[in-house]
Amino acid sequence: MVLIRVLANLLVLQLSYAQKSSELVIGGDECNINEHRSLVYLYNDSNFQCGGTLINQEWVLSAAHCDMENMEIYLGVHNLSLPNKDQKRRDPKEKFFCLSSKNYTKWDKDIMLIKLNRPVKTSTHIAPLSLPSSPPSVGSVCRIMGWGTVTSPNETLLDVPHCANINILNYTVCRAASPRLPTQSRTLCAGILQGGIDACKGDSGGPLICNGQIQGIVSWGNHPCAQPLKPGHYTHVFDYTDWIQSIIAGNTTATCPP
């Protein structure tokens, strides 16, 4: 009963936030061309796509489950069919996973750090995003973005990224939706409780941005997407900042937190 009351109170709170947000469709509205300079498009010749985030001139952060063969990394992209003049393509020079392997699970350690084969310069449509200086608070309004499907369960992929606002929720909300989840996890629970806005297929690996910092990585969610009371799961970047900074500094044997 206590959990039901908590969910009911959170739903009222979410409804008040939703009135301030953009139209409730999966993926939100088309992103402003200048608001996603750190957003990266990962793609291969098998039409597998993911998002990522540029965190400095030669490093990209994404989800471990976004690893793919023949990965192509595009930066400064808005319209996939109409390249920007400063758009760049890079290849992965090295990829790093927790415990120096693909030893992640659906619930934990879904993080991949990619070193580019060549650095990129900051430009009109390319700029890195800061790592978090502190974890986000429950109730924080954060931004998701990506080229993923804007409908579910049927898929509709567009050439431009869509952006939307969602909220950081208490982890117990995600456990209520998925009782098999562990009692603790290095993931963030985020979404809109009444549904209608969500990251979805094709958005994996992209950022959850709160106060100008990357706080989460799109990891997994329910299908169909954007169901009421079934928020999404995001890798909690703050928990991995020491690992990320160690790898970038050259300590390639650094291990992730337990």
From Swiss-Prot:
It is an enzyme of class 3 (hydrolase). Disulfide bonds join C31-C163, C50-C66, C98-C256, C142-C210, C174-C189, C200-C225. Glycans are attached at N44, N79, N103, N154, N170, N251. Coiled coil: none annotated. Residues 19-24 form a propeptide. One of its GO terms (cellular component) is extracellular region. Its EC number is 3.4.21.-. Its main location: secreted. It is found in: Secreted. Residues 1-18 form the signal peptide. InterPro entries: Peptidase_S1_PA, Peptidase_S1_PA_chymotrypsin, Peptidase_S1A, Trypsin_dom, TRYPSIN_HIS, TRYPSIN_SER. The active site is at H65 (charge relay system), D110 (charge relay system), S204 (charge relay system). Residues 25-249 form the Peptidase S1 domain. It comes from the Eukaryota. Expressed by the venom gland. Snake venom serine protease that may act in the hemostasis system of the prey. Monomer. Belongs to the peptidase S1 family. Snake venom subfamily. This is Serine protease VLSP-3. It comes from Macrovipera lebetinus (Levantine viper). The lineage of its organism: Eukaryota, Metazoa, Chordata, Craniata, Vertebrata.
